[in-house]
Amino acid sequence: RDKPADDDLSDDALAERFADAVRDLWANVHGVGLLRYDGKVWRVVDEALLVERARTYLRDVRQDATALAIRRGDKVLESDAKRLGNKGTIAAVARLTAGILLDNSPTLDADPDVLNVQNGVVDLRTGTLRERRPEDYFTKIASVDYVPGARSADWDQALKAVPKKTRSWLQRRLGQALTGRISVDKSVPFLTGGGDNGKSAVLGACSAAAGSYSVTVPEKLLLGSDSEHPTEIMTIRGARLAVFEELPRGGRLNAQRMKLLASTNELSGRFMRENFVTFS
């Protein structure tokens, strides 16, 4: 596709150029909304921020176009440049740019075999660490650095409270949870017993380390009927460790929903006032 000429100050041409200028750090995703890269993750942001970015971009374009018009003695170009500071022009360019970005919508958190951590990206297949890139399109990040071979006396002590016959199994399941893949047995673990068996300490530590990869599941997701609003399921989009803290007295699990969550590679839901989106 041909690039618009630098002296083409139509809304369409300006939006094309503005989209090229921001697409490395801005994205628009179906069913999610507008996102901006902060150096570690892509975060959902208000559309007003794109309008503000368009304002500063058009201010620079206006200055350059005005200088060019004066050198040429081009009164038409000079007049066109003046309108780039108008609220309507700024809003129109931002709106068109959002559509251009949506037309090139990326897939978020797509690679199940890598983990975004504070000091880079871990390849879970090899244990190697690499630099983070915007094109990874992470929306989640662990709260800790990756340090190969690291040990913690507190963690070792917490594990000792877990019954010995289930200790290694629990460690494997929690480790597997950091991948984006469904467990081989397609089951949902339930941790039961009194308050002295280490379950709260172990889950608390893992959830804290997993950062935004860990979520607390709302009651309605597992207890509600199938007719509940689909926004509930969006709480686990991109999550790798989902914890349902405690079954309320008299509560009944939705068996069909449990089976779906444990064995389905793709789920569908939507945020409030957004379109449905399918995610892994």
Question: Residue spans of the language-model regions?
Answer:
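Acidic/polar loop patches that form or flank catalytic/metal-binding clefts of enzymes
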Residues: 1, 214-219, 252-255, 267-272
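Short, well-ordered loop/turn and helix-capping segments at boundaries between secondary-structure elements
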Residues: 180, 208, 212, 249, ...
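Charged, alpha-helix-enriched surfaces in structured cytosolic catalytic cores
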Residues: 13, 49, 169, 201, ...
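Active-site proximal loops enriched in glycine and acidic residues that flank catalytic Cys/His/Asp
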Residues: 193-195, 206, 246-251, 271-273
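AAA+/SF3 P-loop NTPase mechanochemical coupling elements
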Residues: 231-237, 270-280
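Conserved AAA+/SF3 P-loop NTPase catalytic/coupling segment centered on the Walker-B
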Residues: 238-263, 276-277
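P-loop NTPase catalytic core of nucleic-acid-dependent motor ATPases
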Residues: 25-48, 55, 107-109, 114-240
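Intein modules and their embedded homing endonuclease domains
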Residues: 1-142, 264, 269-270, 279
